[in-house]
Design a protein with these regions (language model features):
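Solvent-exposed beta-strand/loop surfaces of large extracellular or lumenal domains
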Residues: 20, 74-84
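Conserved short beta-strand edge segments in small beta-sheet-based binding/regulatory domains
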Residues: 68-73
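Active-site-lining helix/loop region of Rossmann-like oxidoreductase modules
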Residues: 1-63
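C-terminal helical cap and adjacent loop that interface with cofactors, partners, or active-site loops
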Residues: 47-49, 62-67, 80-139
Length: 139
């Protein structure tokens, strides 16, 4: 594209805004293709509104159903697409402060894009819509 972004990067930006319901959200993306058999991996940098305790962030991820924290950099333990292959869970690691921002957070996330990106996500979205009363469950 003329602005230097790829179509995949623009799609990721637009989808993030759409999912979060924030059309004005300032977000950027860099997408690269690497030779892995399956899976998507994302490096995420977030600037939070308020100061945070890193232990609280890690604890929140640990409590979230469907998320596996894999984060022990001293022992070279962090999520890789191979870890996520054939699994529904999202793997999160490299959870750390972004030293370039006052309330910045960095993390690395991987998932099996066929299992989580398509099939499982569709089921989870449907379940959430039923829970919110947006659609009715067929009995």
């Amino acid at each position: 594209l003329d602005n230097g972004y790829t179509k995949e990067e623009i799609k990721m930006i637009e989808e993030t805004r759409k999912i979060l319901g924030r059309p004005d959200l300032r977000v950027t993306a860099t997408c690269v293709r690497v030779p892995v058999r399956m899976g998507h991996a994302v490096s995420i940098n977030v600037e939070l509104e308020k100061p945070f305790d890193l232990k609280d962030v890690i604890e929140a991820f640990n409590k979230k159903e469907g998320v596996v924290v894999s984060d022990d950099v001293k022992n070279n333990v962090y999520p890789m697409p191979l870890d996520a292959a054939g699994k529904d869970e999202v793997f999160v690691g490299r959870i750390r402060r972004d030293e370039s921002l006052e309330n910045g957070l960095n993390l690395w996330v991987v998932a099996d894009n066929i299992r989580k990106g398509a099939a499982t996500n569709a089921v989870q979205i449907a379940e959430e819509l039923i829970k919110r009363g947006k659609v009715k469950d067929k009995e």
